[in-house]
Amino acid sequence: MKRAVVVFSGGQDSTTCLAQALHQYDEVHCVTFDYGQRHRAEIDVARDLALKLGARAHKVLDVTLLSELAVSSLTRDNIPVPDYEPDADGIPNTFVPGRNILFLTLAAIYAYQVKAEAVITGVCETDFSGYPDCRDEFVKALNHAVTLGMAKDIRFETPLMWIDKAETWALADYWGKLDLVREETLTCYNGIKGDGCGQCAACNLRANGLNHYLADKPAVMAAMKQKTGLK
């Protein structure tokens, strides 16, 4: 039996990854992290979506200690989430240092326990927003370390790594989940479901990607299939 663990936030990217995993694996487990995030509403959204989509199990792990160590606008109410600035340079204040290191490591431990061969995460280098822990180089390096440290071949999969937001919408549509992802996921840094606040970087990337996809569905779908190898 093929098993996978999805790092699941209830947002656009991880929900699209879950939809695909459910077609590619016999048993899919979801793991969501409570790290004291500003947008904690995502935890309830993730719980509802995991149940609705048919995950074998959904585990919420308390890692609120991360918020004590990692200073970010996502872990501090007194640091405002910046509005979207397409030309901004450097690492944004929404970056939570160590978050994906912790999430992927804990997900791998969970995968070890449930005998899953893969940990799936929705990080993406094309739209990585300046986050160093969304890069392919980082994921592969951590995967190598985890494999050595556990003496277990647990594979980190990144289905969205080389596709952009428009193509991520196409992937959701390919699996018949476009409307669900559009209406029921939570990507917004300010914790607003669906279209979100419309001001933060997450909302703008999501909206711009959707508009691009809807404006040119055939071309975007074809590009997505070419990059992912889907037929």
UniProtKB/Swiss-Prot annotation:
It comes from Citrobacter koseri (strain ATCC BAA-895 / CDC 4225-83 / SGSC4696). HAMAP family: QueC. Keywords: ATP-binding, Ligase, Metal-binding, Nucleotide-binding, Queuosine biosynthesis, Zinc. Catalyzes the ATP-dependent conversion of 7-carboxy-7-deazaguanine (CDG) to 7-cyano-7-deazaguanine (preQ(0)). Binds 1 zinc ion per subunit. InterPro entries: QueC, Rossmann-like_a/b/a_fold. Its EC number is 6.3.4.20. GO terms for biological process: queuosine biosynthetic process. Its cofactor is Zn(2+). This is 7-cyano-7-deazaguanine synthase. Zn(2+) binds at C188, C197, C200, C203. It is an enzyme of class 6 (ligase). The keyword Cell cycle does not apply. The keyword Nucleotide-binding applies.
